[in-house]
Amino acid sequence: MSIATATFAFSLFATIAFAVPPETPRIELQAERGLGDKSYAPWQVDCPSNVTWIRNATTGLGSGERAYIEAREKLVQPVIEQMMAARGLETPPRTPNIGVALSGGGYRAMLTGLGGIMGMMNESTEASESETGGWLDGVSYWAGLSGGSWATGTFMSNGGQLPTNLLENLWNIDSNLVFPDDDKLSFYTELYTETNAKSDLGFPIQITDVWGLAIGSHVLPERYQLSNTPNLTFSSLPSVVSALGNASLPMPIIIAADRKRREAGELVIAENATVWEFTPYEFGSWAFGSQYKSPGAFTPIEYLGTSVDDGSPNGTCWKGFDQLSFVMGTSATLFNGAFLELNGTDSGLLTNLITAFLADLGEDQADISRIPNTFSNYNSGENPIYNLTYITLVDAGETNQNIPLEPLLVPTRDVDAIVAFDSSYDTDYIWPNGTALRTTYERAKVLAEHENTRVLMPEVPSMNGFVNGGYNSRPTFFGCNDTTTPLIIYVPSYPWSFAANTSTYQLSYENDEANEMLLNGMRSLTLNHSVPTWPTCFACALTDRSFMYTSENRSTTCQKCFDTWCWAGDDNTTEPATYEPVINSVPPWLVANNLSIGVADAPASNESTAGTASSGAAKADVSMGMVALAAGLGLML
């Protein structure tokens, strides 16, 4: 990094890390900026008289979401009929409500998750030949978290293009996410200009603003990237993306979690923390609180940032706070997790330097995302956040719920089936072990204590049970005969053709590597076209709830599928051996059950360690980047 760039980086990040926002936005500069609709910063508008500023979660779906899902259902129904007919299966008596959920895990999760999505797209020749392509057109909801939120943002904002096309024609993920290869001073100048404009209006800024703008400049449409007009809001997506305007894509949901501070000053991200969701229509939560849960509420996301007291605006209204890049950055605020990454570094000097930097950020709350609290003084008798100025949000994966299942488990949404793509870093070799599902199951038991806050999560095994049963190496159906919950089709990342166990903190990918990640993610869903019965069984699982099937009345074909792919309720809690799958191999369970054909034998050596080597390199890359960032902040040992 050049001296000039480092100096400017210092100015930028020092401003962000140590700025203290005023209690309410300043508006004296607004006249100079006009509407500001080409800027990252929010802009002032007249307060509308026909807006419901706070909607209690117990009232069901918001009007915008309800209208979208109704329009979506009309498009989904003929797709379901066509896909079922192609498998020789009966058309369900009602249209199933299907969701997909993409886990967190940085670029690894974005690429692997979008690969899984590609496995459901007819536009992919390989997915079409594997006979799972086409099902995405039958999906109503799409939820993303952290790296999965990047997948959500790039896919939705680009109108649902094939991910390999986005890689070839748009993404520049071969350039480091925070420290671009070209090292242009303009990158930092633009970051400073955009974030400073937001700060000048009195809104809180933090590293999340910079993080989000950087993400957007790598994966959002070029016209909305930092060097052009970084002003794409979440609420504007249905009006600027025709495929969302006419409900041709699933409705997107991005989630984050709140962070609390204990009396002793310890920063806490609890597994039972409030889960917040962003949609093109609303921001809010279905359940407020951590230790005690009460019914949550929602506010129109278009006016997020407006100061509201007990359901009424305080005279000044704002638009533009819901920048899509900011929402994506909020869902992927990984800085707390960086502490975990430091434990494996070899340099004590490096560790001390970055730890000091992160500790300062944590103390000043610059490593979280601050949202002006629209729910201030609302329902103060039951609302645990009624007296907060800001809602403080972090990466929801830090609750260990690294798959955004909860929004799709809410009874009001009536979701029938969820395809859950898991790219979590759970094991020593950066593969999933079911922690995300198990954590959500345990959380669901707490939420079920109150009727108005419950979510409908089927039972799943322990983490040891996932590994010992091989459930973390191939798709598994959960909740097969529990018709009170959605059926979950769990799709873990597995090295079918590539060592996809790269580090969460790998901030750049060469295009060839990214392409292999996408293809491997697709094959984790299609099973590399190696199991002839899989497309039929996948169809059975997606539509089962709409038939109200159980083992007593399910069709012979689908029951045979469920006998094969459903979790049988076993849970071997014995400590498993180290999980280290072999690249280019078939999951042992598929071989043992004589399900797979036409796949080459695994190589003699375990090449998945290449992924570990890649993770080590990634760790070095991000460490050097953090050193430069810390140096820019002028931190000294």
UniProtKB/Swiss-Prot annotation:
The family database entries (Pfam families) matched by this protein are listed as: PLA2_B
Q: Which reaction does it catalyse?
A: a 1-acyl-sn-glycero-3-phosphocholine + H2O = sn-glycerol 3-phosphocholine + a fatty acid + H(+)
Which Gene Ontology terms of cellular component type are present? cytosol; extracellular region; plasma membrane
User: What does the UniProt record note about how this protein's activity is regulated?
Assistant: Inhibited by Fe(3+) ion.
Keyword vocabulary terms for this entry: Cell membrane, Glycoprotein, Hydrolase, Lipid degradation, Lipid metabolism, Membrane, Secreted, Signal
The subcellular location is: Secreted; Cell membrane
Q: Which residues are glycosylated?
A: 50, 56, 122, 231, 246, 272, 314, 343, 387, 433, 481, 501, 528, 553, 572, 594, 606
Query: Topology with regard to the membrane?
Result: Peripheral membrane protein
The EC class name is hydrolase
What family name appears in the similarity comment?
Belongs to the lysophospholipase family.
Record-given protein name: Phospholipase B
Which organism is this protein's natural source?
Cryptococcus neoformans var. grubii serotype A (strain H99 / ATCC 208821 / CBS 10515 / FGSC 9487)
